[in-house]
């Protein structure tokens, strides 16, 4: 579904991603781990169009997308969340979800300005879809609350909900469990598996190794911008190089 081939990204003399190749398989949860500064979020930024790699290819559904802008990547079917929560905190919860639908809405400026029948029908459908997604992630009862009033873990779930609003085929999750307690992490685990059941593949960056080992079908490890290892979770967990670089060797 998504293939990244030999991607290199440089910032002057700094090589942030160095000849990185990986694949996100259809219907699977793919994990990406590595120590702080390994280049994981930078890699997400290459996939999502924030950065254009200096070398290599990013192929989504058979089409090269490196060089696409973020809105084009989103429209193509790749959505993401961020390390730092990026909600419109004064807007209602359901309104934040509707914002995530922007790449799928069809109303013109004229429709919006004059509130045409088409615009009213689209607003109704967007609202109904927002409620369905909020119910899916367990936030329906909070739909009318200001997003900023939600507990931190719930804000994380709202970000995922908003990312789902664009009907992605692949969802990039950047440390979604950060700041969550044990109960919330269990809920996140269940939610990710439900998302895959909806037909959305996931590429996830996460530092919680216990969560990742039970969640990912396949994993990649970055270290100093280079691919250190790949394999099934149990293989990664027992890989001496990974233990030394990330899990903490003796």
Pin down the residues of each PLM region:
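Glycine-rich phosphate-binding loops of nucleotide-dependent enzymes
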Residues: 1-250
């Amino acid at each position: 579904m998504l293939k990244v081939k030999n991607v290199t990204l440089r910032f002057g003399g700094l090589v942030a991603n160095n000849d990185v190749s990986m694949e996100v398989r259809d219907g699977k949860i793919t994990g990406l781990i590595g120590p702080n500064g390994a280049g994981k979020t930078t890699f997400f930024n290459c996939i999502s169009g924030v950065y254009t790699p200096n070398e290599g290819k990013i192929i989504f559904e058979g089409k090269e997308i490196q060089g696409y802008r973020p809105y084009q990547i989103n429209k193509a079917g790749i959505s993401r969340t961020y390390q730092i929560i990026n909600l419109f905190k004064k807007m209602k919860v359901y309104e934040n979800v509707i914002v995530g639908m922007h790449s799928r809405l069809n109303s013109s400026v004229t429709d919006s300005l004059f509130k045409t029948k088409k615009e009213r029908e689209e607003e109704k459908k967007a609202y109904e879809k927002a409620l369905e997604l909020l119910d899916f992630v367990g936030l329906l009862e909070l739909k009318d609350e200001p997003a900023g009033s939600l507990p931190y873990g719930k804000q994380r779930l709202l970000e995922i909900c908003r990312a789902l609003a664009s009907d992605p085929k692949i969802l990039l999750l950047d440390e979604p469990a950060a700041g969550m307690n044990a109960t919330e992490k269990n809920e996140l685990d269940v939610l990710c598996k439900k998302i895959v059941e909806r037909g959305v593949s996931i590429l996830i960056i996460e530092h919680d190794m216990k969560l990742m080992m039970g969640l990912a079908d396949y994993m990649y490890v970055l270290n100093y911008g280079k691919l250190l290892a790949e394999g099934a979770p149990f293989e990664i967990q027992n890989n001496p190089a990974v233990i030394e670089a990330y899990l903490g060797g003796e």
